[in-house]
């Protein structure tokens, strides 16, 4: 997942830490949401421009890397609005995984040693950032099933079972 940030940093010459700071988060301003929506147009801003290290340009460099990766080989890209960036590629399979909040909270508690309240806050914060980021760059709702080829509730699945189900779906979908 972080590999895309490193590759975008290499391609742009922008410090990888800046990509990390903007990773699926938007900087807030009072006019956020009013002035801009869906600024992704596929290009990148040159270094001499004052917006070279803007969030939008950081996103555009990541999008450029995502497109290059998809052109070179089969790959799995998690998040980063890749479904939207690659929307015109007929070979892209867009997957969405979800689970009830109580299951997500339990998982975050176990993985991070957090209390229930801390886990809930973390999930709410991250989901809010991701939803805003996705809406800003795509103009779409992150949780809208129409944006994906396959949506799956992973509640009662082990990782092994999830891999099996997804692999089977991909084989059927590609026929």
Where are these regions (language model features)?
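A short beta-strand-loop structural module common to alpha/beta enzyme folds
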Residues: 1-5
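Conserved phosphate-donor/acceptor-positioning beta-strand/loop module used by diverse small-molecule
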Residues: 88-110, 116-124
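Small-molecule kinase domains that catalyze NTP-dependent phosphoryl transfer to phosphate-bearing small molecules
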Residues: 24-37, 115-159
């Amino acid at each position: 997942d972080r590999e895309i940030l490193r590759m975008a940093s290499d391609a742009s010459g922008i410090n990888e830490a800046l990509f990390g700071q903007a990773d699926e988060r938007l900087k807030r301003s009072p006019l956020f949401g009013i002035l801009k929506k869906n600024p992704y147009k596929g290009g990148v801003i040159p270094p001499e421009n004052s917006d070279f290290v803007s969030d939008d340009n950081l996103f555009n460099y990541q999008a450029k890397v995502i497109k290059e990766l998809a052109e070179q080989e089969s790959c799995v890209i998690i998040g980063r609005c890749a479904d939207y960036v690659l929307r015109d590629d007929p070979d892209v399979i867009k997957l969405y995984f979800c689970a009830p909040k109580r299951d997500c909270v339990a998982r975050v508690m176990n993985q991070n040693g957090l209390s229930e309240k801390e886990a809930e806050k973390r999930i709410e914060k991250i989901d809010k950032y991701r939803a805003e980021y996705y809406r800003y760059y795509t103009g779409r709702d992150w949780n809208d099933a129409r944006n994906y080829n396959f949506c799956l509730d992973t509640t009662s699945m082990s990782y092994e079972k999830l891999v099996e189900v997804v692999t089977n779906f991909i084989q059927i979908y590609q026929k």
